[in-house]
Amino acid sequence: MNPPSEAELARLGARLGDALRARDWRLATAESSTGGLIGHAITMTPGASDYYAGGVICYSNLAKERALGVPHDLIEAHGAVSEEVAAALAVGAAHLFETEMGISVTGIAGPDGGSERKPVGSHYVGVARRGHPARVEHRAFAHDREGNQAAAAMAALQLALDEVAAAA
């Protein structure tokens, strides 16, 4: 399966925007391995400021800790690429921007940086909705770096859309 195109990301970002706008919700993002691709997909739609508050590209552990309040001990215990950190990033984004929802992604885009436990392509996508526990999914992609980033962004957008639909 091919990674999603920029047009596919934009379409899903627009669908998420429509769902958020219908509920009068706002969203924030915390992106590590995708480097802002989720925010880019969302803001390709005119009027995205109605529902997108902003995002943090938290590529380093220090950025995760200082900008989004992820505890240093959590990163030390589980690693930056983990379910626990993805959950904390989503919660931190929603808290920082005072939004109803935060989404996050952390992973290993490649081509280097993988390990036996966490191979290249391994990503965690998270969503946190105010008043509810964060939900995180693990995804494994087998594309080149850009393809892994696009696939992770698509997975995060879809998880957020599913979360909005589940709140109906």
Task: Kindly give the residue locations of the regions a language model identified.
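Short alpha-helical segments enriched in small residues
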Residues: 1-168
